[in-house]
Swiss-Prot record:
It catalyses: Random endo-hydrolysis of N-acetyl-beta-D-glucosaminide (1->4)-beta-linkages in chitin and chitodextrins. One of its GO terms (biological process) is polysaccharide catabolic process. Its EC number is 3.2.1.14. It comes from the Eukaryota. PANTHER family: BASIC ENDOCHITINASE B, CHITINASE-RELATED. One of its GO terms (molecular function) is chitin binding. Disulfide bonds join C26-C41, C35-C47, C40-C54, C58-C62, C84-C146, C158-C168, C266-C298. Pfam families: Chitin_bind_1, Glyco_hydro_19. The active site is at E128. The lineage of its organism: Eukaryota, Viridiplantae, Streptophyta, Embryophyta, Tracheophyta. Keywords: Carbohydrate metabolism, Chitin degradation, Chitin-binding, Disulfide bond, Glycosidase, Hydrolase, Plant defense, Polysaccharide degradation, Signal. This is Endochitinase WIN8. Residues 24-64 form the Chitin-binding type-1 domain.
Amino acid sequence: MRFWALTVLSLLLSLLLGVSSDTAQCGSQAGNATCPNDLCCSSGGYCGLTVAYCCAGCVSQCRNCFFTESMFEQMLPNRNNDSCPGKGFYTYDAYFVATEFYPGFGMTGDDDTRKRELAAFFAQTSQETSGRSIIGEDAPFTWGYCLVNELNPNSDYCDPKTKSSYPCVADYYGRGPLQLRWNYNYGECGNYLGQNLLDEPEKVATDPVLSFEAALWFWMNPHSTGAPSCHEVITGEWSPSEADIEAGRKPGFGMLTNIITNGGECTKDGKTRQQNRIDYYLRYCDMLQVDPGDNLYCDNQETFEDNGLLKMVGTM
């Protein structure tokens, strides 16, 4: 897994630099040297890319550690419930390392904008991985990140319109925090991340860092339907066109639900799932002490043109 690869990288750097594991690699202990490959330098003078290196005490090439492990645990207290199929898979360190690939995530705009994006991302992913039907009804909206693989998929998610570009050689059911689905999504995401996910989609369900990276790929990038990225919407970087305004599409959390579900939860049939997303979001906004903003619902929004590129399906 890539998380362990980072640890190996740190050890290899020690060998290449001709130092022992007890010899400082960076900082004042090493002549104010910085770490290669943009790694963080810890207070002890060692290079790495986890919280221990990049947050408290970090001396150079540090990361934004506003969203702490404690917050992660408070948001997702039941993810390691014994009944959860994904028990032990999702960790704060894996999330933290994955965000390195997307420096704009949670780092765009003022503090409230950053908080709002974090709340929105974890709300949408909590609904996608909800273990409500497994754990039970206690402690409302604490069921997120219980699932890694889609429960009882009713399709192999091979889109005939894109199979010439992205041949279907496996099953492309939902995996990871945003339950990545469809052959084209695995193909495009794999190309972006330098991974052969079309042949090996199971990597999204076996490598925690890659799993978060795949979710963030969908979140951070605009889509071929003409839909903006979720990141652009929630940070205020997207402004609706005249066509968007006529279609009822407005900036806000509801627009994210429209994008992620391709409008599937903006109808009467999807009302319960849409409300779940909103309730997760309100809980997380309260935890982060930020106003959720306007336009939480997508009821009156038209979907973007369906050319087979956005077909994310929510869970109960």
